[in-house]
Regions:
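Class I S-adenosyl-L-methionine-dependent methyltransferase catalytic core
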Residues: 1-193
Length: 193
């Protein structure tokens, strides 16, 4: 996977000022494929960027799409089937709260340094579970990043029995054993069955 991203290390994807990190096209393609977007889904990409998610959506009638500029994500309303993007890390907590108000499913890129116990607890406490993740290493970004999909799901017997925790999910994503069993066990605890 790293070989693919080395091809895209050029000026187009370098870090930009004002908390804007442009998402490379191959990363957007992976995210879109992971989300399994259906033809009638309403999808929101609230991040400021070059439109890489919009441009790579699966076949859809883009005449029904709306691109708005100078609109604040925090003023958005309604419900969406999916929110996808690479949000500004400086606004993570506020961004997550607004996201969870607007959707039951979201797919974001988290920098590992932003994937904290507190943020995981904030997400899990609202009834979301991690359904997919994909670890990325893009050398010109700050550190490792992870694509994560969270979905609001009813608590089921499996999750209740094993008690999903923010610590379990966080440690597994970082590739560490939390001391609660093998990494394999931690990995399974993060998934809805």
């Amino acid at each position: 996977m790293n070989k693919i991203f080395r091809k895209f290390e050029n000026k187009e994807y370098k870090l930009k000022p004002n908390d804007i990190i442009y998402t490379p096209k191959p990363v957007a393609e992976i995210m879109i494929k992971m989300c399994n977007i259906q033809p009638n889904d309403t999808v929101l990409d609230p991040s400021k960027g070059g439109g890489v998610f919009f441009d790579n959506l699966p076949e859809c009638d883009k005449s029904y799409c709306e691109i708005t500029e100078n609109i604040d994500f925090f003023d958005a309303s309604g419900k969406y089937d999916l929110i996808i993007g690479n949000p500004p890390y400086s606004l993570w907590n506020k961004w997550l709260d607004k996201t969870m108000e607007l959707t039951d499913k979201f797919c974001y890129i988290f920098g590992i340094m932003n994937f904290t116990h507190a943020r995981m607890a904030r997400i899990l406490d609202k009834g979301y579970v991690m359904t997919h993740y994909h670890l990325l290493k893009i050398s010109y970004w700050f550190s490792h990043s992870v694509i994560v999909i969270f979905e609001k799901k009813p608590i089921n017997t499996y999750m209740t029995k094993f008690s999903v925790s923010a610590e379990t999910c966080y440690c597994d994503i970082c590739g560490k054993d939390c001391g609660r069993g093998s990494k394999g066990n931690s990995y399974n605890k993060c998934y809805a069955k």
